[in-house]
């Protein structure tokens, strides 16, 4: 069983403590506990849900999952970046899952390293099994998840994310590897891992970020560049990846800016402006291109399509009014359980003077959301005017 405990982060003049009983808590997530049979221990993870998740009108929505390693360090800022970027339509809304550490050297190192003193490195594959065979199934049971998953890791976490990307099979679709610690991967080890890479890795997207390590900078950059270029050569088509170097960031300061750049690279062109779209065909081709690059079917976001439709519905050009209906109908095809999609179709038919079709679609909206007073009032007023 998982135990849910509220995680409340209070931001009051930069102070994380409650100064008054009247202060309202700003809750950004919940704590969960999962008893792992694979790891033989209890593992804590934190969850941040999208803003629309608890909206009854959006109960049909399912969300991609972002799994964050070293979650105690990265949870707050990543949740904030995801919330902001999805709010302006640059990326999809997603569920953020941050894993709290128990023994990161054990969990994040794929290979056993031989040292003078005994160590417990080399548990990376076991930890990936925990993520894929226990954590993800639990998330699927408890939340409305879509089977598109991103793995974020920094330092040793970046090493594990890279290792997961290079495996024959994985449940993750994209990877953000921030300044990965490749110190245990000498040339021989790296070549061995590259030899084992199959075409399946190139059906995924990976982002690498490199920090400025000062005197050790050349060595660090060379390791990242060597792996990136070797993967690029091995990929027969266009390599779905990006490598970025941050001259002004060190190993400790790079994660926030690299996460922003990485998630932007994954969802490049996702945030197309509603003002730049003229036809449904243009929009569908745009998202087909994104889907092809990411090997996953990303539909045009409902909110984006709705905004395009209403822009055209309010246009003085009569042709735009008919085109608005096409966009609204597209939403009903992609999101058949959306009350708002049918409500918008009703609005378009109303402007076009087809009361029968308008009432028909408002009724569909009301069936999907019986609490929709807007649809109820529209039906009532249209029936009166007949």
Residue ranges and their predicted role:
Residues 72-128:
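Active-site machinery of serine-nucleophile hydrolases
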Residues 110-155:
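Gly/Ser-rich "nucleophile elbow"/oxyanion-hole loop immediately N-terminal to the catalytic nucleophile
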Residues 310, 347-350, 381:
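Residue-level recognition of tetratricopeptide repeat
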Residues 20-62, 331:
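A domain-start/cap signature at the N-terminus of enzymes
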Residues 183-249:
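The feature captures the conserved acid-bearing segment of alpha/beta-hydrolase catalytic domains
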Residues 298-302, 321, 339-340, 373-374:
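Helix-start (N-cap) detector for alpha-helical repeat units in TPR-like alpha-solenoids
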Residues 221, 225-228, 235-298:
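C-terminal catalytic histidine-bearing segment of alpha/beta-hydrolase fold enzymes
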């Amino acid at each position: 069983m998982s135990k849910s405990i509220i995680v409340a982060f209070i931001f009051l003049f930069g102070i994380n403590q409650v100064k008054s009983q009247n202060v309202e808590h700003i809750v950004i997530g919940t704590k969960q506990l999962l008893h792992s049979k694979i790891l033989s221990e209890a593992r804590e993870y934190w969850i941040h849900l999208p803003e629309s998740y608890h909206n009854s009108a959006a109960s049909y929505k399912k969300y991609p999952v972002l799994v964050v390693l070293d979650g105690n360090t990265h949870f707050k800022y990543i949740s904030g970046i995801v919330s902001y970027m999805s709010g302006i339509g640059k990326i999809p809304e997603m569920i953020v899952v941050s894993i709290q550490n128990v023994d990161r050297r054990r969990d994040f190192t794929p290979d056993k390293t031989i040292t003078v003193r005994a160590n417990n490195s080399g548990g990376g594959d076991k930890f990936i099994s925990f993520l894929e065979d226990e954590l993800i199934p639990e998330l699927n049971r408890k939340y409305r998840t879509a089977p598109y998953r991103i793995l974020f890791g920094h330092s040793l976490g970046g090493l594990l994310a890279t290792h997961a990307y290079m495996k024959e099979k994985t449940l993750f679709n994209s990877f953000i590897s921030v300044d990965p610690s490749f110190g245990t991967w000498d040339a021989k080890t790296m070549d061995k891992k590259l030899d084992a890479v199959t075409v399946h890795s190139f059906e995924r997207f990976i982002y690498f970020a490199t920090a400025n390590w000062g005197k050790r900078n050349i060595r660090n950059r060379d390791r990242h560049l060597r792996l990136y270029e070797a993967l690029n050569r091995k990929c027969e088509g266009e390599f779905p990846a990006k490598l970025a170097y941050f001259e002004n960031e060190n190993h400790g300061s790079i994660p926030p800016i690299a996460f922003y750049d990485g998630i932007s690279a994954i969802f490049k062109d996702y945030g197309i402006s509603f003002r730049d779209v003229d036809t449904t065909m243009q929009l569908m081709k745009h998202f087909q291109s994104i889907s092809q690059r990411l090997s996953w079917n990303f539909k045009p976001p409902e909110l984006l399509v709705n905004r395009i439709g209403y822009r055209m519905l309010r246009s003085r050009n009569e042709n735009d009014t008919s085109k608005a209906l096409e966009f609204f109908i597209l939403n009903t095809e992609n999101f058949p359980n959306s009350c708002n999609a049918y409500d918008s179709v009703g609005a378009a038919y109303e402007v076009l003077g087809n009361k029968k079709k308008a009432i028909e679609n408002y009724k569909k909206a009301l069936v999907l959301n019986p609490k929709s007073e807007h649809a109820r009032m529209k039906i009532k007023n249209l029936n009166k005017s007949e």
